[in-house]
Amino acid sequence: MDEGNSQAFMPLASTPQVASMTPPVAVQTGDGVYSNTQIKAAIKSGHIVFHPYIEEHIAGSSVDVTLGHWYYRTERNTNGGFYNPFDEGDVQKYFDGPHSAETHQIWAEANCRKLFSVIPADQPIIVLAPGERILAHTHEFIGIKAPGTSTMQARSTWGRNGVAVCLDAGWGDPGYINRWTMEIYNMNQHHFVVLPVGERIAQIVFYHTGPVEGQYKKLSGKYQTDTDADLGSLIQNWRPEQMLPRGYKDKRRKTLPL
């Protein structure tokens, strides 16, 4: 792990003291996707959590989220072999990190490169090699309480630039509120790609659902620390290690007969 505490990069103006995240204060009624007016109303009522709140990031039917500071590299062991994602030890070996994004200036000096145009020298960046995949996170803590669910989609600009942001895991169950983990993959075969920290990289879409029985943590919540915690506690207790997959927590079941 890089030197320093996992919370070294926590540029949130303050730790908000808010009520318990369950049950919701109010529930938006309707069908389908939340519109921007419904999103704003749900944020105001406490049914949707979006912190830090930036109104300009609320689009017509989604909320833009930005790239956070921490990341894990994958497949750092180039000797090949087998990876068992259901073994906690294998998971720890497979993922390299967590790493903290370096400033543009420091990265350029370390790699004997000139500064890239447009990107400020003091901007933290993550540089992906051709074909490289990393685990990264949103800077924002975001999600919706039950009833309701959400998905994360890459912003189209990144897709057009050959970068997959949510490779295959962009679903947020009812009640999941946290920083979201992103599987970012550079699909370019010959070009490195620069990812500035703080850049809008994905968008969260919220959906209406019917009543939900049970809480996220009890139903499927391997990645939520405490559904009853307030937002301030989530922010204070967040660690980069929460990005790592936890398939080893699933119960193994015998194959059902045909």
Positions of PLM-derived features:
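DUTPase catalytic domain/fold
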Residues: 2-258
